[in-house]
């Protein structure tokens, strides 16, 4: 008979339930003396039941939790009854197998959001394996993902050391196991109750560094239960950490799987950030950029001389700045004192061209005041054919730290609109044929020129 929720044996089951113990229930008194239980940052009323959600595995339907009258959260494994048929059927979102003649009616109403990742649609609660998310994973590690309410949760899982020559794959886990090791299923476990103290509050973060996993994520590497201890600090030994999980959340904007993972957060291709080191905090003088799935970090070099006598250090910036520094003036363009051109407000335009390994990345950026941000249009071209095009919006503070950008002109919103409309046409046209000068010609639209008589 086919088993469900094969997770590597009793040790792993105990580990997941130990996570529930660490998570902690919390009593909260409100008006009318109502008692609530707090579990995973959610409130539950007395008597309310639910299945716990464990990333990256999704809802664990073979564990029931209930909020007791004294505010304790009690979780127990589901006891499955014996089935009296030859071919019991496993139903999605149910723990115990059923005989075909006792199946519940099909409900066509879908209440939960699906997820889209790398061109594939996954339903709420569905598990899958992702490749290429963690570039620094070890040979004994794999990436497990699950879909929950439209978001994709992925974890780096360290698989246990195998003692057999021919391991096999099992459902609902990216790790391979020895034949027979994964045969223990939730429904055949005893229905022990695991109590969670009401005065304990152990919240978990959705954006933790993979160098500092929370204790609840390390529960998978525990050797026994109860009496096992969690270990803080660096990742455990690869042979012991059979369930070490690093959680990242992938929003729907990462549909192509081109993301970088840093400090427990994900960044899209072309996105930049300052690294956050546990011992030093945010390192302002280092800038990292996501290049497809590889993060490239460079040190920011400050000028040796400044145009003012006493440059000032500003919090959040690497280099000193001159107080009251004015924007650069552009030769060949004349604007009035308020930065207007023919009565229309102008905004600075920046350009960056970077070439590496036969690939050209060209960026055009427009700085706006309302809202105060920079809109960056990124083109990646190889052998004259557009490989990738996307638009990202970043803060001015972040943009000032980006390398390779230079101020090329100032333009108006009307000219920028013409540029973006032409850009949309070129992005379709140049994705299937060679384009040599189309983008360069389009950029010229942003340059503002008066007629010889000075009329607008």
Swiss-Prot record:
Domain VWFC: start-end pairs: 35-100, 113-179, 258-323
Range of residues in the leader sequence: 1-27
SMART domains: VWC
Keywords attached to this entry: Developmental protein, Differentiation, Disease variant, Glycoprotein, Neurogenesis, Osteogenesis, Repeat, Secreted, Signal
Motif (Cell attachment site): 179-181
GO MF term list: BMP binding; transforming growth factor beta binding
Pfam families the record matches: CHRDL_1_2_C, VWC
Record SUPFAM superfamilies: FnI-like domain
Induction: By hypoxia in retinal pericytes.
Location(s), subcellular: Secreted
Region listing for Disordered, in residue ranges: 202-223
Entry GO CC: endoplasmic reticulum lumen; extracellular region; plasma membrane; synapse
PROSITE patterns: VWFC_1, VWFC_2
Residues of this chain annotated as glycosylated in UniProt: 118, 291
Tissue: Expressed in the developing cornea and in the eye anterior segment in addition to the retina. Differentially expressed in the fetal brain. There is high expression in cerebellum and neocortex. Expressed in retinal pericytes.
Involvement in disease: Megalocornea 1, X-linked: An eye disorder in which the corneal diameter is bilaterally enlarged (greater than 13 mm) without an increase in intraocular pressure. It may also be referred to as anterior megalophthalmos, since the entire anterior segment is larger than normal. Features of megalocornea in addition to a deep anterior chamber include astigmatic refractive errors, atrophy of the iris stroma, miosis secondary to decreased function of the dilator muscle, iridodonesis, and tremulousness, subluxation, or dislocation of the lens.
Function: Antagonizes the function of BMP4 by binding to it and preventing its interaction with receptors. Alters the fate commitment of neural stem cells from gliogenesis to neurogenesis. Contributes to neuronal differentiation of neural stem cells in the brain by preventing the adoption of a glial fate. May play a crucial role in dorsoventral axis formation. May play a role in embryonic bone formation. May also play an important role in regulating retinal angiogenesis through modulation of BMP4 actions in endothelial cells. Plays a role during anterior segment eye development.
Designated name of the protein: Chordin-like protein 1
Species this chain originates from: Homo sapiens (Human)
Taxonomic lineage of the native organism: Eukaryota, Metazoa, Chordata, Craniata, Vertebrata
Gene: CHRDL1
């Amino acid at each position: 008979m086919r088993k469900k929720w094969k997770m590597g044996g009793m040790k792993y089951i105990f580990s997941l339930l130990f996570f529930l113990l660490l998570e902690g229930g919390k009593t909260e008194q409100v008006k009318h003396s109502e008692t609530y239980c707090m579990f995973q940052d959610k409130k539950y009323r007395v008597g309310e039941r639910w299945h716990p959600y464990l990333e990256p595995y999704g809802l664990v339907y073979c564990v029931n939790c209930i909020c007791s009258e004294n505010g304790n959260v009690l979780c127990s494994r589901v006891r499955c009854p014996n089935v009296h048929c030859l071919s019991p059927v496993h139903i999605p979102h149910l723990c115990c197998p059923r005989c075909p003649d006792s199946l519940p009616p099909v409900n066509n109403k879908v209440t939960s959001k699906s997820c889209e990742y790398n061109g594939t649609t996954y339903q709420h609660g569905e598990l899958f394996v992702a490749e290429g998310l963690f570039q620094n994973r070890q040979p004994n590690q794999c990436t497990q993902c699950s879909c929950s309410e439209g978001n994709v949760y992925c974890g780096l899982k360290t698989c246990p050391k195998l003692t057999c020559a021919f391991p096999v794959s099992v459902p609902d886990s990216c790790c391979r196991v020895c034949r027979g090791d994964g045969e223990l299923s939730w429904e055949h476990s005893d229905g022990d109750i695991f109590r969670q103290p009401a005065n304990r509050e152990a919240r978990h973060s959705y954006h933790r560094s993979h160098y500092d996993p929370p204790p609840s994520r390390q529960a998978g590497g525990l050797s026994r239960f109860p009496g096992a201890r969690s270990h803080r600090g660096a990742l455990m030994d690869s042979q012991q950490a059979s369930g070490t999980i690093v959680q990242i959340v992938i929003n729907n904007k990462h549909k192509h799987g081109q993301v970088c993972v840093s400090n427990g957060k994900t960044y899209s291709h072309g996105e930049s950030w300052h690294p956050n080191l546990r011992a030093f905090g945010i390192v302002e003088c280092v800038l990292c950029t996501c290049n497809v799935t590889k993060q490239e970090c460079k040190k920011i070099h400050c000028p040796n001389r400044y145009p003012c006598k006493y440059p000032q250090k500003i919090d959040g910036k690497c280099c000193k700045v001159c107080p009251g520094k004015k924007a650069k003036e552009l030769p060949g363009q004349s604007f009035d004192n308020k930065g207007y051109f023919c009565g229309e407000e102008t905004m600075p335009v920046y350009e960056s061209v970077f070439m590496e390994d036969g690939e050209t990345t060209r960026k055009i950026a427009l700085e706006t005041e309302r809202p105060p941000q920079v809109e960056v249009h990124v083109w990646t071209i190889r052998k004259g054919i557009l490989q990738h095009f996307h638009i990202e919006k970043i803060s001015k503070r972040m943009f000032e730290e980006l390398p390779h950008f230079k101020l090329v002109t100032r333009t108006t919103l009307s000219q920028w609109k013409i540029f973006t409309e032409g850009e949309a046409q070129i992005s379709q046209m140049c994705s299937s044929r060679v384009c040599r000068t189309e983008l360069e010609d389009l950029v010229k639209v942003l340059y503002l020129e008066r007629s010889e008589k000075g009329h607008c």
